[in-house]
Design a protein with these regions (language model features):
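Conserved catalytic-core motifs characterized by acidic clusters
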Residues: 22-40, 69-72
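Soluble C-terminal extramembrane regulatory/interaction domains of multi-pass membrane proteins
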Residues: 43-185
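A conserved active-site cap/scaffold subdomain adjacent to cofactor or substrate pockets
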Residues: 11-12
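Short, small-residue-biased leader/transition segments that mark boundaries at the very start
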Residues: 2-6
Length: 185
């Protein structure tokens, strides 16, 4: 259906960017005329994998949401608010890095704010936002939300370890010391 067409187009676009970045890196290593572009190419390569992961994560989240609604189940209002905030942040990031945009000044101003907003979303994305009668799909959507937060923090320049540390722990033994924002407790 239409969703499959969109999925293929999105994945094709991401794959094209990954391939172009690799070609650009190879060319910049060989050609002295392109040596000055190495830093930009490395930055592009650094963000493309988390972008790819986020796109895939959104597709998985969408399938879970479809299953949830087909079963006539729901997620909590807190989960809806979290997803709404995350989608607004992702839109802002896509507009910031949009095709043909000049980077630099806008990034320096907007990225710190977007990172702070993502940290708050990560800090609120705990098991406690699932309704007491929450379904497996609600938990799966929460898991995907958390994964997308990590991917988007990495797009904004954080390491994976630092990004994961901004998630409210769901384990008694989190792999990375928590640096959680946006929680009252």
């Amino acid at each position: 259906g239409l969703g499959d067409v969109y999925k293929r187009q999105t994945q094709d676009s991401v794959n094209t960017l990954l391939s172009a970045a690799q070609s650009g890196r190879e060319a910049s290593e060989v050609s002295p005329l392109l040596w000055a572009s190495r830093r930009s190419i490395r930055s592009l390569e650094r963000i493309l994998m988390p972008v790819d992961n986020a796109v895939r994560g959104v597709r998985v989240l969408s399938r879970q949401a479809l299953g949830l609604t087909e079963d006539r189940d729901k997620v909590s209002d807190a989960q809806v608010e979290l997803l709404d905030e995350l989608s607004e942040i992702m839109l802002a990031i896509s507009e910031l890095y949009g095709q043909g945009k000049q980077h630099g000044h806008d990034e320096a101003i907007e990225i710190p704010d977007l990172v702070q907003r993502l940290r708050i979303v990560g800090g609120r994305a705990g098991l406690d936002i699932i309704d007491k009668d929450g379904t497996l799909s609600a938990y799966m959507i929460l898991g995907q939300t958390r994964s997308i937060v990590v991917d988007m923090l990495m797009v904004c320049g954080l390491s994976r370890e630092s990004a994961v540390a901004h998630l409210v722990p769901t384990s008694q033994h989190p792999a990375y010391p928590p640096e959680v924002w946006g929680r009252e407790d």
